[in-house]
Amino acid sequence: MPEAVPNVLSIAGIDPSGGAGLYADLKTFAALRTYGCGVVAALTAQNTQGVRAVHVPPVEFLRAQLDTLFADVAIAATKTGMLASAAVIETTAERLAHWRAQGQSPIVVVDPVMVAKSGDALLDRQAVGALVEALLPLATVITPNLPEAAVLLGRTAPESRREMIRAAEALRALLPTDDGHW
């Protein structure tokens, strides 16, 4: 009997070029032989030169997307990407916690998207606080780049190998553990 294909959810922004965000996640999920599902957390007008506009749908719509999907589809893992506001982050965290308690999405990968590839800032200070306080406690894995790691830790970006190791250890301390051991 063939193995069931795991359903994997991306909660992220839409990059019309397909080079990042929800569309890129879905391509990655397909390449990894999983079935990708997507919840739109933001819409962007961007290209390789920069972000021109960001539209954040109402959190009620985000909640409706999440609840409708989780009520019907068994999600093995969730990856978050661009969550463009504190309200979006808090709603995402609240719904993930709710559905995890129902046995859904035991694995949560948080990509703390804070800066576009063009260098444009995507999160304000309040949203970063919500990310650290509400979403990171649910994370199984986080995938910050060096500038994002610096923001999460409130320090300058690590440059040396030793600084990177210290930053990785500090980031690991932000994640929950089952028994207190890694």
What are these regions (language model features)?
Residues 2-10, 28-118, 122:
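Conserved N-terminal subdomain of the carbohydrate kinase-like
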Residues 125-182:
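Conserved phosphate/ATP/ADP-binding segment of small-molecule kinases
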